[in-house]
Amino acid sequence: MARYETVIGVEVHAQLKTKSKIFCSCSTRFGVDPNENVCPVCSGMPGVLPVLNATVVEYAAKMGLATGCVVNPVSVFARKNYFYPDLPKGYQTSQFEQPICEHGHVDITVDGTAKRIGITRIHMEEDAGKNIHSAADNLSYVDLNRACVPLIEIVSEPDMRGPEEVVAYLKALRAILVYLDVCDGNMEEGSFRCDANVSLRPVGQAEFGTRAELKNLNSFRHVQKAIEYEVERQADILDDGGKVIQETRLYDAAKNTTASMRGKEEAHDYRYFPDPDLVPVRIEAATLDKWRAELPELPEARRARFVADFGLSDYDAEVLTAERDMAEYFEAAVAAGADPKKAANWMQSELLRELNQAGVAARDAKLTPEKLASLVKLIDSGEISGKIAKQIFPDLFAQGLDPADYVRQKGLSQISDSNALESAVEAVLAANPAEVEAFRGGKTKLMGFFVGQIMKATKGQANPGLVNELLQKKLG
């Protein structure tokens, strides 16, 4: 029986998909030369004044609406004071006592069990710059391209009790952000970052234990591994009679360990106070109603609809709705006449593999949903076999070819003429007399062998159903 209960809360920083930064007109484009997207405002020069990007407010409010939050009609920016080389002003412009959104939730399912994870708050803030350390000349450089890029921080309640719940929560949160088109969810580029606050307490105890904050979690797998390690580390300390220190720890993926980075600060350490350069943000009720009406169908609702309308399994619906463009691709394929379950199977196997190998999103695939539907219908009609379809799929995907035209040009149509197949069946039986005798002696599993030989002889073009029928007659 477990001695301790794990308690986890998560802070997610999501970079918003605005064209310009939160308080200036500099571009937010990723991957440019260091300090290319910098101006006096985002570099913290004296005497400059920030101007709030209205789109940031809209995106933050829409995320709040999508997660059932109360969107406050008035919210206030505050200065979070601390020193770090990549923070040019000596403070971060964030929100503290009056955030834009509060009291929301996200529903997750782990191992068939549904659970609601509370969201404490969502607030707007600016990102910091980036330190670049050069071992060659023993210097550290500061790139301010990321400084002043708009973020929303989404703070959960400490409702999660294991790494599996955390990963499910993060995936659900990321899916909502992507569906809203307010964040691209790219963890590798830092558009979706998370910190996990992990603590243990004896089973049955109401009071929380001392927490450690885990950073450098840049993939869902790293989140899982880091929390597993941290839970074990804290349990060992408590078993030995020690006390867990409140601190920030950095996850090392290569070693699969966490190491102390610094003491964990409390809110009072940052000396928050309202930013005098920014007026309170006011959202009119009519504006909020407009934004609410613009919300798209969200992942949870679409998942339920896929199960109800298309007869998909919960698993298939979850996979297809995890990414908005995959869900839209699926619906377009079904609208073009593809059987829903068969389209789902082809998307999860062949299409997803090719997309991952090519590094492209479904919306950018040369093989359109209509062409995938055409392929599925060719199989259903008996024009080609599933085996042939799998063989030609890479070419169809890479070149965006029309399946019917490709099959006709290559002469790949399935052989469904019984007279044409009968000679192939007789040839295979004549070439394998021992197997024929064994089959007639009761080894009926050899049917698969005969079918395989005929498919080989016809280069996979024989109609499997007709082959079975002819074999039964010949061997009966």
Curated annotation (Swiss-Prot):
A molecular function annotated in GO for this UniProt entry is:
asparaginyl-tRNA synthase (glutamine-hydrolyzing) activity
| Database matches in InterPro entries | Asn/Gln-tRNA_amidoTrfase_suB/E (IPR017959), Asn/Gln-tRNA_Trfase_suB/E_cat (IPR006075), Asn/Gln_amidotransferase (IPR018027), Asn/Gln_tRNA_amidoTrase-B-like (IPR003789), GatB (IPR004413), GatB_C_1 (IPR042114), GatB_Yqey_C_2 (IPR023168), Gln-tRNA_amidoTrfase_suB_CS (IPR017958)
The protein's Enzyme Commission number = 6.3.5.-
One annotated GO biological process: translation
Name of the top EC class for this enzyme: ligase
List UniProt keywords, sorted A-Z.
Answer: ATP-binding, Ligase, Nucleotide-binding, Protein biosynthesis
Q: Which PANTHER family match?
A: GLUTAMYL-TRNA GLN AMIDOTRANSFERASE SUBUNIT B MITOCHONDRIAL AND PROKARYOTIC PET112-RELATED (PTHR11659), GLUTAMYL-TRNA(GLN) AMIDOTRANSFERASE SUBUNIT B, MITOCHONDRIAL (PTHR11659:SF0)
- Tell me its family: Belongs to the GatB/GatE family. GatB subfamily.
Q: What subunit structure does UniProt give?
A: Heterotrimer of A, B and C subunits.
Q: What does this protein do?
A: Allows the formation of correctly charged Asn-tRNA(Asn) or Gln-tRNA(Gln) through the transamidation of misacylated Asp-tRNA(Asn) or Glu-tRNA(Gln) in organisms which lack either or both of asparaginyl-tRNA or glutaminyl-tRNA synthetases. The reaction takes place in the presence of glutamine and ATP through an activated phospho-Asp-tRNA(Asn) or phospho-Glu-tRNA(Gln).
Write the protein's name: Aspartyl/glutamyl-tRNA(Asn/Gln) amidotransferase subunit B
Q: Which organism is it from?
A: Solidesulfovibrio magneticus (strain ATCC 700980 / DSM 13731 / RS-1)
Q: Which gene encodes it?
A: gatB
